[in-house]
């Protein structure tokens, strides 16, 4: 009796999403019958011993040395490549076959007890819907291997037997989930057209659209959106983390999937359930300038607030993300918006450059050359500059003078009078109330007498 291969007994359910890949050939960590298809390599000649040529035993054939039955049964293109590379048996046993079925490893005398041989279609349907120790049906395995003819045949068997295509394995994955994870858009289109539900949830509450965005596969997402019947695909469905497919696409920073979701009507301001963050706030917290610009170009609300009242500008200012702060301010972000702690983006900012941008100082372009003074510029003097000039005595102190009027010029040929700040300041008149104000901690100083008095 042949022995089981090493590691075959202690192999548990295979997590195709989180299990690390083996260092060898692709799919080497999977069971033999679930590995992806590859071109068969020529087998080396067996060494000759004292007893002659030694024929190696195949553990999946049960030690039988009979050749496989030639010819594809029921239109299957290449059934021997259905489960692993090399010559295998047909999809279901026949009378001319003397070896066990490759999926269940039952000898031929026991198989007619399960499926009568006079109903080959019933045998096909029974074996196509039978799950192994991992909960995988032959349809799961054919999808993982990317065997499109076998997927066609098995889908037809499911439909003829009245079975649903949404069969979960032990990891709560349907064949459609596996088709999206392995990025096979043709298989995705085939399964959805045949009746697979695009809203089936995996163990994380994710639909096929979530998985397509998570694995950065815009081709699978497009195939899913094109082949789904109207009203059967909800793009606003949340997973167990409260995220929509658009949130997942923004977090993976795949602009093609984001663009595709927005074109198909996904809500650009949808908030997650846990924190109330919009996709724009997620993009800001990921420090993705290109994603922020893409969302703003499609009309995202720049002042959207999460449950704590903070906006995208709060997040960018508190993290010191200078390019994002500048982009949000130019897009109309409100710097006076307060969160639940009564903090504005200016109050949570820690960087001096961010503070300057929020105050409007760093956004003004710096002038490289100073223009020559002209009468027009002197006529448009600001009130602050006119007040500084009047305090220095450069402008007339008469009440009738206004800041918009320039000071009178001296006639030609006469020198300009010296400014007032070169002359001693006159003493205040006696009738002003502040004439006797204290100048120090001592006594009040009496007003000085008027000039010319005794």
From Swiss-Prot:
ANK repeats lie at residues 134-163, 171-200, 204-235, 241-270, 275-304, 308-337, 338-367. Residues 405-418, 443-454 have a biased composition (Pro residues). One of its GO terms (molecular function) is transcription coactivator activity. It is found in: Nucleus; Cytoplasm; Cytoplasm, Perinuclear region. Residues 1-50, 360-454 are annotated as: Disordered. Polyubiquitinated. Ubiquitination via 'Lys-63'-linked ubiquitin chains is required for nuclear accumulation. Deubiquitinated by CYLD, which acts on 'Lys-63'-linked ubiquitin chains. Deubiquitination by CYLD prevents nuclear accumulation. GO terms for biological process: antimicrobial humoral response; canonical NF-kappaB signal transduction; defense response to bacterium; defense response to protozoan; DNA damage response; DNA damage response, signal transduction by p53 class mediator; extracellular matrix organization; follicular dendritic cell differentiation. Disulfide bonds: none annotated. One of its GO terms (cellular component) is nucleus. Residues 365-381 have a biased composition (Polar residues). Residues 21-31, 382-404, 432-442 have a biased composition (Low complexity). The modification Phosphoserine is found at residues 41, 374, 402, 406. Keywords: Activator, ANK repeat, Chromosomal rearrangement, Cytoplasm, Nucleus, Phosphoprotein, Proto-oncogene, Repeat, Transcription, Transcription regulation, Ubl conjugation. Component of a complex consisting of the NF-kappa-B p52-p52 homodimer and BCL3. Component of a complex consisting of the NF-kappa-B p50-p50 homodimer and BCL3. Interacts with N4BP2, COPS5 and PIR. Interacts with CYLD. Contributes to the regulation of transcriptional activation of NF-kappa-B target genes. In the cytoplasm, inhibits the nuclear translocation of the NF-kappa-B p50 subunit. In the nucleus, acts as transcriptional activator that promotes transcription of NF-kappa-B target genes. Contributes to the regulation of cell proliferation. It is linked to A chromosomal aberration involving BCL3 may be a cause of B-cell chronic lymphocytic leukemia (B-CLL). Translocation t(14;19)(q32;q13.1) with immunoglobulin gene regions. This is B-cell lymphoma 3 protein. It comes from Homo sapiens (Human). The gene is BCL3.
